[in-house]
A protein has these predicted regions:
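Noncatalytic alpha-helical scaffold of FAD-dependent oxidoreductases
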Residues: 1-204
């Protein structure tokens, strides 16, 4: 099965995620969802907007930015000319990769009309290790250790106490700052890596 999608630039991230979920696939660069911050619907932004600003989420340090996942596009430049670049395979460009130049240009070089993007299979299991109530220095120390660890986390964040009122963390009811570190992979692998990470962080 081909690991790419070809979509119109105005397609919402929500719609793309719903279709990819059916095939157990994902946008690996994981664009953040800020809809709830602006009292909007979740993931109502478009794939064209995401690529125009080269927007990526927590998995960026592992898999790269949105720019690293675009395979090709069609668009319109400032002269009204239709342009296209790339295709639907990874090695499809010689010389300048126009797709990567346009991505992140905020629409100043071209406006996307159609985009081909690489997708990846979802992990079998995802778990998030949460360390409660670290002060800022300790929380950042945990992140530094974890993100450089052989446990290969796919995301990490420190939430200060004043952020906690803005988010719901499943069944976590305690207050105070937290450090969260995400591990993905097969069930056996994830459990082993979580245990190893607990030892490396010296927490229980």
């Amino acid at each position: 099965e081909e690991l790419y999608i070809k979509v119109k630039s105005g397609t919402s991230i929500k719609e793309i995620k719903e279709e990819l979920d059916k095939k157990n696939q994902q946008l690996a660069f994981e664009p953040n969802d800020f809809g709830f911050l602006f009292e909007g619907e979740s993931n109502e932004g478009t794939i064209g907007g995401v690529l125009s600003i080269n927007f990526a989420g927590p998995r960026r340090f592992k898999v790269g930015s949105a720019r690293d996942h675009i395979l090709g596009f069609k668009g319109v430049n400032g002269k009204g000319e239709i342009i296209k670049s790339g295709g639907t395979v990874v090695k499809n460009v010689t010389g300048y990769d126009l797709s990567k130049i346009i991505t992140g240009s905020f629409g100043t070089l071209s406006v996307f009309t159609e985009i081909s993007v690489k997708v990846l299979p979802k992990a079998d299991l995802t778990k998030t290790l949460i360390v409660e109530n670290p002060h800022l220095k300790k929380g950042l120390e945990y992140l530094n250790i974890a993100l450089g660890s052989s446990t290969d986390p796919s995301g990490g964040v420190f939430y200060p106490e004043y952020f906690r009122s803005q988010f719901v963390f499943n069944d976590l009811t305690t207050e105070g700052p937290i450090t969260a570190i995400r591990i993905e992979g097969s069930k056996l692998s994830v459990d082993e890596r979580i245990n190893q990470l607990l030892k490396e962080l010296n927490v229980s």
